Every structure is written in C-alpha cells, then in structure tokens.
Amino acid sequence: MARVTVEDAVNQIGNRFDMILVAARRARQIAVQGKDPMVEEENDKPTVIALREIELGLVTADTLDADERQTVREREAAEIAAVAAIAEGRNDIL
C-alpha cells in the first residue's frame, strides 16, 4: 500500500480545497472514464495515482479543463458527423 503525503500536491495546486477538487476529478477520469494514468500504477488506487500526478505537476485544474473541453469537442464532432450521415441517407431516399 502506498503512503502518500499531500503536502507536495498542495504546494503544486495552491490550497487543500482546490487540491481535493482536482484530485477527485482526476481520480474519476482514471476510474470511471478509463483515462490512462500518467505515472506507473504500482497497484495503487485511482486517488493515489491522481495525487502522485499532481505532485509531479502533470495534472492541474487547467489541464483537466482543457482535457474536458477537448472531449466535448470530439463528442460534438462525432454527433455532427452522425447527423450528416443520416441527412445524406435521407436525401438519397427522397
């Protein structure tokens, strides 16, 4: 089991409260959304992995926001492509 001190993570983010929010978002990405960890897993839980990534400066609120915006853009592009394919199919029928 990994022993993690959060002091380095707090120093990277600025305060404990924001660090908790960033760590929770990143842990959720790893556990639920299937995002790949940026550090070795070493049989650690997603929360520990998230804290280690924050300590190393790999994850910040800004990087999470940018990743989220990119995911939304990709999802919207896929939806637009699907709608366009449907519309083209209907035009062929008419």
From Swiss-Prot:
GO terms for molecular function: DNA binding; DNA-directed RNA polymerase activity. Promotes RNA polymerase assembly. Latches the N- and C-terminal regions of the beta' subunit thereby facilitating its interaction with the beta and alpha subunits. The keyword Transferase applies. It holds the Pfam family RNA_pol_Rpb6. The keyword Transferase applies. GO terms for biological process: DNA-templated transcription. HAMAP family: RNApol_bact_RpoZ (MF_00366). This is DNA-directed RNA polymerase subunit omega.
